[in-house]
Regions:
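Protein/peptide-recognition domains central to ubiquitin and immune signaling
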Residues: 1-163
Length: 163
C-alpha cells in the first residue's frame, strides 16, 4: 500500500515508516481547528492538523505536524519526512483524494501540508464519482497518513536555509 502513495527515494535510507488512519465523524459539527490523536514514527510523535472549513481558504486544509507539546521538542530536533495524506470515503476507499510532500520538520517549523487540500464545494455539494458518490458520506470521511522518516547523514537534507 505504501508504494501506491509514496514514491521510492532510492538515494535515501528509510529510518521508519508508519500508517495512521483517522476516522473523521460528524464533520459539520467540528471546530475550526482539530488535531488527530498522536502516533509514532521514527521515534517521534506526529499528528494531523485539520481545518475542516479551511485555513484562510475555501478548501479543507490538512497538515502533518510533529506531536511535541509547545517547547518540548528536543533542542536542535529535526526530522526529514516524506508523507502522503489520503482523504477517502468512509465506506469505499476507492473514492479518494491525495496530496504528497517531503519536508524537514524542526521544532520551530512543526507542520507542513496542504492549505488547499480539497475545495469545500467538492466535498459538500458535488458528486466525486460519475455514479454520484461523494467523498464525504454520512457526514464522515477517513484520513490516512502514510509517513516515511528518512535518515539525514548530512544534517541539511531538505533544509531551506531561510533562518
Amino acid at each position: 500500500m505504501f508504494k501506491k502513495y509514496l514514491a521510492e527515494l532510492p538515494d535515501l535510507e528509510t529510518a521508519d515508516e508508519a500508517v495512521y488512519t483517522w476516522n473523521i465523524t460528524n464533520w459539520k459539527a467540528l471546530e475550526k481547528k482539530v488535531h488527530s490523536e498522536t502516533f509514532q514514527c521514527g521515534g517521534h510523535p506526529w499528528r494531523i492538523l485539520f481545518f475542516p472549513y479551511g485555513n484562510q481558504s475555501d478548501h479543507a486544509s490538512f497538515y502533518l505536524e510533529h506531536g511535541y507539546e509547545e517547547g518540548q521538542a528536543p533542542e536542535g530536533w529535526a526530522s526529514c519526512v516524506q508523507f502522503c495524506l489520503v482523504l477517502s470515503n468512509p465506506n469505499d476507499t476507492k473514492i479518494y483524494m491525495q496530496q504528497s510532500a517531503k519536508h524537514r520538520f524542526q521544532a520551530d517549523e512543526g507542520d507542513w501540508g496542504f492549505t488547499r487540500f480539497i475545495e469545500l464545494r467538492k466535498l459538500f455539494s458535488q458528486p466525486f464519482t460519475p455514479e454520484g458518490r461523494h467523498l464525504l458520506e454520512d457526514n464522515s470521511a477517513t484520513l490516512t497518513a502514510f509517513v516515511r522518516v528518512v535518515k539525514d547523514p548530512t544534517g541539511v537534507l531538505w533544509h531551506n536555509f531561510v533562518k
